[in-house]
Structures are given as structure tokens and as C-alpha cells.
Amino acid sequence: MESTIPAKPDFSNKVFAKDERFWLNYLEGRPTAPKSFFDRIYRYHEEHRGHFGTVHDVGAGNGPYAKELRLKFSHVIVSDIAAENVTLAQERLGNDGFQYRVSRLEDADDIPPGSVDMVFATNVLHFCDQDVAMRALARQLRPGGTFACASFGSAYFADEKVQEIYTRIGRAGARLLLKTLDDPERLLRAMDRTDGTYNVAPLDEKLFMPGAQRVDLNMPERGMLSPLPPEMEVTERDESHTRPSDVLIQEEEDEWKFSMNIGQIKAHIESFPFGKDVATELSPLWREMENLVQDRRIDGHWPAKIILATRADASVE
């Protein structure tokens, strides 16, 4: 199927809509999901007798993972809230086996119920209304289909001084971004969900089978690192979305390790929505980083969270 379905995004383009230069930097500065990441998802899908017909890549940005998904699935739906991102995805990926939508993740009434074999949601679900989003995703999944959710992006550096400056840059950048938004509370809640356990995806037992997997890869004791400024209060904090029946898995994988020079560290920081401010408001902090790192390579790893669940044989009211 080949089509472009228009919609009206309702969240600030200051967070989501990015140009081609940003996405080129994103591909350079963010972790490359290793083969083991996709192998785990496909293996889970196969073990639960999933089909490889249609996958919906939600909150896809410019579709950095869509090409990989197309290698396994006959049809890939690429959706994002920002029209600019979807246009870039279509220009890069073409129309052979791809369909494009401009839409919030929560808005999916145009997708026929039970028509999707897998929903693939990477680095996006924390921005959404959790209950509304999960009902929308469950509605489009066929019984036995797979919900595959993941988050990765913030680095953990082995050098404690580098990590400390990196944390300060992230928090300072978040403060700048929050000042530009009409609804900063929404972004605060999103950042809060990414801190620690990556608290997303309430799995209603009527919609998803018991035994869902919540996988921590290379996870530090404190969990994931969010840029949430410590002085900013989140007025409505989510309760834990982990069910008693969920299977908790902790593993280490060498494929998520890295060694960065100063240029690569800069590319990584510039891959965040506040990245453009490195050359302006954040320049004093960046000079601290340059003076500390100089010509060294800094080792570290990418913590990752993967959530895998199977659609139950039930309707969504």
C-alpha cells in the first residue's frame, strides 16, 4: 500500500519537527541499534506465532529503523506527529512497501482494527497519554500481534567527570527547551517517565496477554538518566506500569558499548532537541567538556529498555 494520510499534530513542533540536518546528526550521534536488538524482537514475535505482514513504526521521526523493519515485513506504516519528518522519511525510503501517516500515536482510527502484526515504538511512548496510547495501539493489533517498545539514547560515560558535565548539559538544555513550550508540564512528565525504569506502557490484562517482558540492557543501578532538572516538580507522576505478571529481565550486551572522541560526544549532544544551543547558551558548559576530554577517547555504554507484549484475543471498546 502506498499513501500519505494527513493529520493535524497537536504538540509543539519545537520538540518534534526537525530538518534534514538534524536527522543526519541524529543518525550520527545516537546509538545504532545492534543486530541483537532486532533479533530479540523478531524472536519474541515468532515464538508467539506472529505474522510478518504489516508493522506500524509509530513516532518514527524520519524513519531510521523503517528500512530494517522492511527486511522482515511486507508492509511498513511510518507515522510521526510532524509532517516535515514524514516527508523526509518518504524521500529517503520511497514507496515500495511503505505507507506514510502524519498523526499522533494516540490517533489511529484510520487504521483498520486488527490489521497490524506488530507495533514498533522506539523512543516515543514517554511523550504520550499512556492509557489512550495503549488502547490505540491495542485496537490496531491483531490477536497474537506484538507490541514492541524501546528506549535508548542517553549515554553513560565511564569517566565520572565527563558524566557529570554531560548531565549538567542535559539539564541546562532541558531548561532552555521548557521555556519555549506552551505546555511545559507535558514535557516534564515525559522526562520523568524516562528517568530510572522507563515507566511506560500500562498493559491492560484484557488487551495484552500475561507474561510480557520488560528487559533492562546494560542498566546502571539508578536506571536510565533523564535530563529532568532536579528543581522542577512534576505535579502528576505516573504510578508504576509494571504488572505482577510481567517478566523482568536484566542482561548485559557488549554491542551497546562505545568509545567516543570529543567530536562524537558533540554529535551525540546535538542529537537532542536542545542540541542547537551547544554553540550559544550552552557554550560555557561545552568548553568545560572540551577542556576535560581534549584528544582522549571516552568509554561508556548505552542503557536500553525493551518492552515486549502480545495482544490478547479481545476487543477494544
Curated annotation (Swiss-Prot):
GO BP of this protein: methylation
Disulfide bonds: none
Presence of keyword NAD: no
Expression induction: Expression correlates with the formation of the sclerotia and thus the pigment production and is directly regulated by the cluster-specific activator CPUR_05433.
SUPFAM superfamilies, A to Z: S-adenosyl-L-methionine-dependent methyltransferases (SSF53335)
Region (Methyltransferase domain): 57-149
EC code(s) of this entry: 2.1.1.-
Keyword terms of this UniProt record: Methyltransferase, S-adenosyl-L-methionine, Transferase
A Pfam family this chain is assigned to: Methyltransf_11
Pathways per UniProt: Pigment biosynthesis
InterPro entries (UniProt xref): Diverse_substrate_MTase, Methyltransf_11, SAM-dependent_MTases_sf
One of the record's GO molecular function terms: S-adenosylmethionine-dependent methyltransferase activity
Function: Methyltransferase; part of the ergochrome gene cluster responsible for the typical purple-black color of the ergot sclerotia. The ergochrome gene cluster produces several ergot pigments including the yellow ergochrome secalonic acid and its derivatives, as well as the red anthraquinones endocrocin and clavorubin. The pathway begins with the synthesis of atrochrysone thioester by the polyketide synthase (PKS) CPUR_05437. The atrochrysone carboxyl ACP thioesterase CPUR_05436 then breaks the thioester bond and releases the atrochrysone carboxylic acid from CPUR_05437.
Similarity comment text for this entry: Belongs to the methyltransferase superfamily.
Name of the protein in its database record: Methyltransferase CPUR_05424
Organism whose genome encodes this protein: Claviceps purpurea (strain 20.1)
